[in-house]
Amino acid sequence: MSREMDANEAEPRYVISIAARMLNVQTYTLRYYEKVGIIEPHRSKGNVRLYSDRDIAILQRVKSLVDDMGINLPGVEVILRMMEHVGELQSELERAQEELHKLKRGRE
């Protein structure tokens, strides 16, 4: 079920005008974030930018870091990379804990 939710979160569904409205930013802000590499929206066959729920969540974090905390975009990029790395480490830890649990059950 988690993978299904992940797939739904990654599905591109919002055009740039809708994404901008959801985030209360201008479309040029989203284009700029794409230009500097903070976000990479999916492109339709007609080359229209499409944002997923996951993209929107990332952009909400970016907006919060910039607007609420005053962090500049290079700092935001570092924070986003660190958050991604922490998420990967958490997944790895969960897999290791599951494997350990299986091994313990096998001994009993």
Give the role of each language-model region.
Residues M1-S64:
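Basic helix-turn-helix/winged-helix DNA-binding cores
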